[in-house]
From Swiss-Prot:
InterPro entries: Ccc1_fam (IPR008217)
Vacuolar side: 59-64, 191-192, 249-250
Misc remark: Can mediate sequestration of iron ions into vacuoles when expressed in the yeast ccc1 mutant. In seeds, iron is strongly localized to the provascular strands of the hypocotyl, radicle, and cotyledons, but completely absent from these cells in vit1-1 mutant. In dry seeds, vit1-1 mutation provokes the redistribution of iron in cortex cells of the hypocotyls and in a single subepidermal cell layer in the cotyledons.
Function of the molecule: Vacuolar iron transporter involved in the transfer of iron ions from the cytosol to the vacuole for intracellular iron storage. Involved in regulation of cellular iron homeostasis. Vacuolar iron storage is required for seed embryo and seedling development.
Organism from which the protein derives: Arabidopsis thaliana
Residues the entry annotates as binding Fe cation 1: E103, E106, E114, E117, E154
Top-level taxonomic group: Eukaryota
Protein name per its UniProtKB record: Vacuolar iron transporter 1
Region entry Cytoplasmic metal binding domain (MBD), spans: 91-166
Gene name linked to the record: VIT1
Phenotypic effect of disruption: No visible phenotype under normal growth condition, but important reduced growth and leaves with severe chlorosis when grown on soil at pH 7.9 that causes limited iron availability.
Compartments (UniProt record): Vacuole membrane
Gene Ontology CC terms, in alphabetical order: vacuolar membrane
Topology of this chain in the membrane: Multi-pass membrane protein
Length: 250
């Protein structure tokens, strides 16, 4: 909650109730966007270099070639994914600013219509006309609060964090790099690619399983199901790349 919103809340809430709020702490998970970026980065970082390494191993490439190509892919993938996260966040910012300007103009141009929309929104929550009329009138006296209300409850938009774009870019890129080096580790230690690919499969599938379990835990889905699904997708991708390389080679 921003300082401005906190000020509004403290002014409008009775002292006794404000005291209760000040001494009450709710344990909610509030890092959803960061977790989403980590999931995107790690899942792609584990899967894409894993499939590439398996495909090159299937084509009988040496460990040094697989490692070189893998590192190049991790670097390019991290930049690409990070840039994608940055552009997506900037698009959200632009969309919010555009909709806020439009809503602000409507509040000035057609205030009666906008007030009717406030009443309609409140009525959807089972609030009677005699109960929501004071709320509508109070919002009309405070244009900024009125605008915030319409943005949240009519359009369902939350104001983006201005730091979100860079945060998303770096989080996704770093997560991609961390995930991408796991399937490449065996190629750093084992000179024969066909031996390295076996170790890579074991290590990466285990990492995918652990990652899938953690993803399920944080997203609220069934952890074991998420773990098996994530590992299965990685196995399919690497097997397809390996088999395709063998087919092309022959």
């Amino acid at each position: 909650m921003s300082s401005e919103e906190d000020k509004i809340t403290r002014i409008s809430i009775e002292p006794e109730k404000q005291t209760l709020l000040d001494h009450h702490t709710e344990k909610h998970f509030t890092a959803g966007e960061i977790v989403r970026d980590i999931i995107i980065g790690v899942s792609d970082g584990l899967t894409v270099p894993f499939a590439l390494a398996a495909g090159l191993s299937g084509a009988n490439a040496s460990s040094s070639i697989v490692l070189t190509a893998g590192i190049a892919e991790v670097a390019a993938g991290a930049i690409s994914m990070g840039l994608g996260g940055y552009l997506a966040a900037k698009s959200e910012e632009d969309h919010y600013a555009r909709e806020m300007k439009r809503e602000q103009e409507e509040i000035v141009a057609v205030p009666e219509t906008e007030a009717a929309e406030v009443a309609e929104i409140l009525a959807q929550y089972g609030i009677e006309p005699h109960e929501y009329s004071p709320v509508v009138n109070a919002l009309r006296k405070n244009p900024q609060a009125w605008l915030d209300f319409m943005m949240r409850f009519e359009l369902g938009l939350e104001k983006p964090d201005p730091k979100r774009a860079l945060q998303s870019a770096f989080t996704i890129a770093i997560a991609y790099v961390l995930g991408g080096f796991i399937p490449l580790l065996p190629y750093m230690l084992i000179p024969h690619a066909m031996d390295a690919v076996v170790a890579s499969v074991v290590i990466t599938l285990f990492a995918l399983f652990i990652f899938g379990y953690a993803k399920g835990h944080f997203t609220g889905s069934k952890p074991l199901r998420s773990a098996f699904e994530t590992a299965f997708i990685g196995a399919i991708a690497s097997a397809a790349a390996f088999c395709l390389a063998k087919v092309v080679q022959h």
